[in-house]
Amino acid sequence: MDGYQYEHHCAKLLKQRGFRDVAVTKSSGDQGIDVIAYNENVKYGIQCKYYSYPVGNQAVQQAYAGAKFYDCNVAVVMTNSTFTEPAKELAQKLGVQLWEKSYIPN
């Protein structure tokens, strides 16, 4: 699976979990958001990272900025992997949700 395929995989998982109006953004110039989805009238901006190593700060920064650009209520980084401690700290400060191992919370 590559990054593009993972974005579509994430979109499929979101639909299965009851998110609606799930859309994958264009691959270039996406402003840091790969998928936009709604759950209970909350707009999520999701950065998808398919990595073989822990995701770092840059993805958190991209999700935060991209969510602002798309007027999302919630910024998320979703990965098949895990996150570095600095990324976790930054996400907590910025209010970015981190979904590890493709886990989508209720």
Mark where each language-model region is:
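Mixed-charge (Asp/Glu-Lys/Arg
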Residues: 1-106
